[in-house]
Amino acid sequence: MVAVVALTVFNSFTLQPQGWRFIGDKWAAFGPDRDVLRVGGNDAFRQIKIKVTDGPLRIDDLDIYFENGEKMNVPLKNAFRAGQESRVIDLPGGVRKLDRVEFLYSTIGRSKGRARVAVWGKR
């Protein structure tokens, strides 16, 4: 039973339809926070999206830094419930290698729990 639950949770984060690949994640602490997700590796993407799980979260700003030093600002300003995803974010210039993704966010509601912010990419 525990193995089935663990496999189900693992699959919900690692397997996505239509070619989406898990890039990385961060856990948002209670209150306002700024986090950096270092990407690295040889993968390149045309699109990314953000998925929030385990608690509600307000994402105010998202900065995407590319391997060549360019920066893309995405002003999301969205409140996400657990399980919600952002819109698909098209990266300029076709397939791009990511260096890092920076988030400015805060947990919302009265719960003092943490929300998980996962970044997914599509080639």
What are these regions (language model features)?
Residues G24-A28, N73-R81:
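Solvent-exposed serine/threonine-rich low-complexity stretches and specific carbohydrate-binding patches
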Residues R58-I59, R81-Q84:
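A short local loop/turn or secondary-structure capping micro-motif enriched for an aromatic residue
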Residues L15-R38:
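Transition segment at domain starts
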Residues D35-G40, E85-G93:
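Exposed aromatic-hydrophobic patches
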Residues V2-V9:
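Bacterial N-terminal signal peptides
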Residues D54-L76, K112-K122:
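Short, surface-exposed beta-strand/strand-loop-strand elements in extracellular ectodomains
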Residues F30-P32, G41-F45, G55-L57:
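Short, surface-exposed loop/turn motifs at beta-strand boundaries within globular domains
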Residues D43-I50, G93-G109:
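Noncatalytic modules at the cell exterior or secretory-pathway interfaces
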